[in-house]
């Protein structure tokens, strides 16, 4: 199957893009090639599809639930008790709704962490998106739960082969306060053995940092360093509370970080995410929406806006985090973080693209 997009606007220039076997083969002006399908790109902007690098798709079912609460009471009193009641069918339909929402706002790939992996995978398979799905690990420092998580993920790494190549598996230890050091070290070895990523919430709140020092004797990043699990396979969500030395640790070990501005604001976890400092140190910084209960939507355009405005506000610097940098975080950096050659409109990259209609009419009567 080949596709030719004719006359679209790419970085302000009229451009043609030729696609073959889901890959961009040529980018230029007035391409003279034959294609199975020709798309009229006139008056449309051509952009890479967004990569939502951290979310919990089926939490569309919890949108607006548990509002106005800090993280731990929100998790312990609202989210975890109700997640325990979800059926496989609930997760399936919640994920399908999430996929629809992401498609409508330009997301083509997402990185998910949630229960009932197979229900999520079935929904994604049917909706046509690309996804990296993390098999969740909790043990709450109980050996019997650690063994259960190990056995489940040993099955998932095999089961994912039953799906198309659009769907990949990662291992997802929830956080250092719900997963023991022993299980984290097992996960590190398991991920290396199977060449899969690891996804973990880390350094999300000041309370997490205080408790980490009290429980383990180290801040969260230093604790992972002590355990020996900082590596290029590790992708951490949030990473708000890190100092300069820890940023260097992350960079030196190739750890990727996903910024989630909406949920950080809603849960008042923190707003001083060190986007500029991490990028300068060489850390790949991607962007995510988090789940709908803690951010209320899966709109990566809103996530870009919030990330940029927050960064400018707390730094008191209107030049911080320009549009080009935050757009790169939402596209190419997200793809790089999860191991995809996507997020750029260039030869050899996956043709995960969006056309934005520049002539949409807005009915002013509907917004008065």
What are the language-model segments listed below?
Residues 49-60, 197-206:
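Histidine-centered catalytic micro-motifs
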Residues 198-206, 268-270, 277-303, 345-353:
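Short acidic/histidine-rich active-site segments
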Residues 350-368:
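C-terminal cap of metal-dependent C-N hydrolases
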Residues 63-128, 150-163:
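Alpha-helical scaffold segments that flank or form the walls of functional sites
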């Amino acid at each position: 199957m080949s596709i030719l997009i004719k006359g679209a606007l790419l970085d302000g220039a009229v451009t043609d893009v030729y696609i073959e076997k889901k890959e961009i083969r040529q980018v230029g002006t007035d391409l003279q090639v034959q294609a199975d399908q020709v798309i009229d790109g006139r008056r449309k902007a051509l952009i890479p599809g967004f990569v939502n690098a951290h979310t919990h798709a089926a939490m569309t079912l919890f949108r607006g639930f548990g509002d106005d609460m800090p993280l731990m009471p929100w998790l312990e009193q609202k989210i975890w008790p109700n997640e325990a009641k979800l059926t496989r069918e609930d997760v399936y339909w919640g994920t399908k709704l999430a996929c629809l929402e992401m498609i409508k706002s330009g997301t083509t790939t997402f990185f998910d962490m949630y229960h009932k992996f197979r229900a999520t995978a079935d929904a994604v398979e049917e909706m046509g998106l690309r996804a990296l799905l993390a098999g969740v690990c909790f043990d709450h420092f109980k050996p019997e739960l650690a063994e259960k998580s190990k056995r489940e993920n040993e099955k998932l790494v095999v089961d994912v082969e039953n799906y198309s190549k659009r769907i990949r598996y990662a291992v997802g230890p929830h956080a250092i306060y719900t997963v023991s050091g022993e299980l984290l070290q097992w996960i590190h070895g398991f991920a290396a053995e199977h060449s899969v990523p690891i996804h973990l919430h880390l350094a999300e709140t000041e309370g997490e940092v205080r408790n980490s020092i009290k429980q383990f004797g180290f801040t969260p990043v230093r604790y992972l360093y002590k355990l020996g699990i900082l590596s290029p396979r590790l992708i951490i969500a949030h990473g708000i509370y890190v100092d300069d030395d820890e940023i260097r640790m992350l960079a030196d070990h190739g750890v990727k970080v996903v910024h989630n501005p909406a949920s950080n604001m809603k849960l008042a976890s923190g707003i001083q995410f060190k986007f500029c400092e991490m990028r300068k140190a060489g850390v790949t910084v991607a962007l995510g929406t988090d789940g709908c209960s803690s951010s209320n939507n899966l709109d990566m355009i809103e996530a870009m806006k919030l990330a940029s405005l927050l960064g400018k506000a707390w730094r008191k610097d209107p030049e911080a985090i320009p549009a080009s940098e935050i757009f790169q975080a939402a596209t190419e950096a997200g793809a790089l973080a999860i191991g995809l050659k996507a997020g750029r409109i260039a030869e050899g990259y996956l043709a995960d693209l969006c056309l934005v209609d520049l002539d949409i009419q807005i009915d002013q009567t509907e917004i008065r």
